[in-house]
Amino acid sequence: MNKEKELIDKLIDLAFAEDIGDGDHTTLSCIPATAMGKSNLLIKEAGVLAGIEVAKEIFNRFDPTMKVEVFINDGTEVEPGDVAMLVEGKVQSLLQTERLMLNVMQRMSGIATMTRKYAKKLEGTRTHVLDTRKTTPGMRILEKMAVKIGGGVNHRIGLFDMILLKDNHVDFAGGIDKAITRAKEYCKEKGKDLKIEIEVRNFDELQQVLDLGGVDRIMFDNFTPEMTKKAVEMVAGKYETESSGGITFDTLRDYAECGVDFISVGALTHSVKGLDMSFKAC
C-alpha cells in the first residue's frame, strides 16, 4: 500500500468513526436493511470537480457492494444541473456515506476551483502557483490532491520531504550561513536526498545566499513586485525562485511577470469556500 492511499484510508476510517459512532440510529430505525436505492450527485454551482476518486473509495470502504457510475471526471469544469455520478446500493449505506462524501467533494472541488482561477491568471508566464502547509488538520493529502487537480503544483507535503529554512530557523541558527551549512551537513550525515529552500527578507540576505550557495530554491518573503524583479535579476537563473507573503489574486500577475518560477498562495486551502452540490435519491 502506498503512503497516499494509507493516509486516505486512515482519514476515511476516522471520519466514519467520528460521524457514525455506535450507529446511525436515524437510518437504522426507519430504513430496512434490505432496502435498495439510487442517488445522484447533483452539481449546484459552477466550478471544477474534484474528489470523485476519493468518493469511490469512501463508498467501497464502507460497503463494497455499492455500485458507482461516474459521468464527470476529476478536473472537469461543471455547471449547475450537471450530474457527476450515480450510486446504487443499500439505502442504509447511501444514507450513512452521504455526508462524508459531500464534505470531501465540496471541499476538494472548492480548492480545485480556486486553484484553476489562479492558474488561468498565470497563463502565458513561466510561473506556477504553489500550495502551502496551511491546510485542514488530517485532510492535507486530499487538499493537496485538489490543488493538483485544479492545475496547481504541490509544495512540500509536510516537514519531512523538503528542507525549508524560514526566518525563524535562520534567526535561531544564528544566521543564513549557519542555517544552510547545518542543513547540508544534516542531509549528508542522515543520507537524506532533500531539496533545500531558504527564505530571504531583504537584498542583504539574498546576497548572502548567493555568495554561499548550497540551496535549490530561494523564497522572496514579502517582497514588492519591484523588489522581486530585482531579486530575480540577482539570482540570474542559478536557483529556482519563489514569491510568498501578501500576494493576492489581484497582484498575482504582477509577481509572475517578474519572472519567478513559483508563487505560493495559502488562500488556495486555508479559506476556500466549498462547491455547492447535493446527493439525492432518484
Please provide the spans of the model-predicted regions.
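Active-site loop ensemble at the mouth of alpha/beta enzyme cores that anchors a bound cofactor
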Residues: S278-C282
